[in-house]
């Protein structure tokens, strides 16, 4: 069943007339056309009969025509009201309630004479949750490039270098491999600075005998990777190395349990129980992982409360961590494809 067919099914389920897609990445997902509209209206209208109408600034119309999108295009000038160019009466409209602003909702009520609204958020998340072969190939390439980023960063480590200098070196050097954008702000943290799970790289200088935490990802043809490695520089303290070994055991055990039909919470429990049994449970303050695709964090989450089942075609991260202030912060993260038989690890840099 096609993506549009799934939306039409949901329209029928909710007795709605059309769906209004406004998140730029979701518009891309359905149309193959990517835009960053800023404050301008950029939206896809999907009607119950399957008709698709893309609203975009007039200056982008020719680019849309060159894209895979084959539906109707409503291009508007900055001085025009887009809704006046496509007058409609839509009794019930499904919207992305997690994205649409109140101001834009008021425009829809006025412009399309909308009587009531429903949500289409979950349907879109469920669609994006299962990746096509084309999507998987792009994520696999993004993961390969993330491995290269770690390699670049590790080779640049030397006493006295700052966290920020390593970040800059990675992001500049990876451009030689065709990368134009990182998935998120690259994180490189030295020693016990990594005990802050979302620390900001700064002017701290690398010293011998401490760990270096790398958390990074790249975007390849719109799809993200997201990986973490914690690398020894010299010989860290005995406790720091013990923490590393516990995190590695937790990650390895969780990954090995991945296969279709397993509740996501069970995967979280495996890693969390190992860390807790070793006495570090209070130092593992976040979920085990999350979905990965057009965004670095997307549906679903690998958490202790998520009873949904793993399905073939999902791509998730597994990233246990232990963060002890004044001692060390260790996180190890891999990107995992759920296959019919079990799993495939997409990130490969040594651990």
Swiss-Prot record:
Entry's cofactor comment: Binds 2 manganese ions per subunit.
Positions that bind Mn(2+) 1: 226, 290, 319, 333
Any one GO molecular-function label of the UniProt entry: hydrolase activity
InterPro entries recorded: Creatin/AminoP/Spt16_N, Creatinase/aminopeptidase-like, Creatinase_N, Pept_M24, Peptidase_M24B, Peptidase_M24B_aminopep-P_CS
Necessary cofactors: Mn(2+)
Enzyme Commission number(s) of this protein: 3.4.-.-
Protein name, entry field: Uncharacterized peptidase SAS1635
Organism: Staphylococcus aureus (strain MSSA476)
């Amino acid at each position: 069943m096609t993506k549009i067919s799934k939306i039409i099914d949901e329209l029928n389920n909710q007795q709605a007339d059309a769906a209004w897609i406004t998140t730029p990445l979701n518009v891309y997902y359905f149309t193959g056309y990517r835009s960053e509209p800023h404050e301008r209206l950029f939206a896809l209208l999907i009607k119950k009969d399957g008709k698709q109408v893309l609203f975009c600034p007039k200056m982008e119309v020719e680019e849309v025509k060159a894209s895979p999108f084959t539906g109707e295009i409503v291009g508007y000038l900055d001085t025009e009201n887009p809704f006046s160019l496509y007058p409609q009466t839509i009794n019930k409209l499904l919207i992305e309630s997690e994205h649409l602003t109140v101001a834009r909702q008021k425009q829809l009520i006025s412009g399309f004479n909308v009587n009531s609204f429903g949500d289409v958020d979950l349907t879109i998340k469920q669609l994006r949750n299962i990746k096509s072969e084309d999507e998987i190939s792009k994520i696999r390439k993004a993961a390969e490039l993330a491995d290269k980023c770690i390699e670049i960063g590790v080779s640049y480590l030397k006493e006295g270098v700052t966290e920020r200098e390593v970040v800059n070196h990675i992001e500049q050097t990876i451009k030689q491999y065709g990368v134009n954008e990182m998935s998120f702000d690259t994180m490189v943290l030295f020693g016990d600075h990594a005990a802050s799970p979302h620390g900001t790289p700064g002017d701290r200088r690398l010293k011998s005998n401490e760990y270096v935490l790398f958390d990074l990802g790249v975007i390849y043809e719109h799809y993200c990777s997201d990986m973490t490695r914690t690398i020894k520089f010299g010989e860290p303290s005995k406790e720091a190395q013990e923490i590393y070994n516990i995190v590695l055991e937790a990650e390895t055990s969780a990954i090995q349990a991945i296969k279709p039909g397993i509740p996501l919470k069970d995967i979280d429990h495996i890693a969390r129980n190992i860390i807790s049994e070793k006495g570090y449970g209070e130092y593992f303050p976040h979920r085990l992982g999350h979905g990965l695709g057009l965004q670095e964090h997307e549906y679903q989450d690998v958490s202790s409360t998520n009873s949904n089942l793993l399905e073939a075609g999902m791509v998730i991260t597994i990233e246990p961590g232990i963060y002890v202030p004044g001692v060390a912060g260790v996180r190890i993260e891999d990107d995992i494809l759920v296959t019919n038989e079990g799993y495939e690890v997409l990130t490969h840099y040594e651990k």
